[in-house]
Amino acid sequence: IINFILVGISLYEYEKVCECLAGDFAALPGLVSKHWLANEENNTYGGVYIWETEEAMQNYLESELFHGVGANPALANAESKEFEVIEALSEITRGI
């Protein structure tokens, strides 16, 4: 899960930029899904990523895409937290 705030751009502008990047994320090896998050009232945005393997996630964290997005000054105070999926419970609730 990654969270950040927007600095100097609106939600609309952010969405337009992300539309251009969505295909790059979709092409990432091992990415099962990415859910884009927004809370305009609190100026908090981010994403929930589901990976096939920890190796796929680590490859993303070392990629040009990750570092390029992270270097964008409009995305400030970025925080990333890693979690493991509890498979048995997630299956019950139709998780991926």
Where are the predicted features?
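Glycine-rich beta-strand-turn "strand-cap" elements at beta-sheet edges
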Residues: 6, 37-41, 69-96
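Short amphipathic alpha-helical segments
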Residues: 4-33, 64-69
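Short acidic, gly/pro-rich beta-turn/loop elements at beta-sheet edges
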Residues: 12, 57-59, 90
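Residues that cap or initiate secondary-structure elements
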Residues: 8-10, 55, 86
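A generic short-segment signal for beta-strand/edge and adjacent turn/coil regions
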Residues: 2-5, 13-20, 47-52, 75, ...
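Short, well-ordered beta-strand segments in beta-rich or mixed alpha/beta enzyme
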Residues: 1-4, 35-63
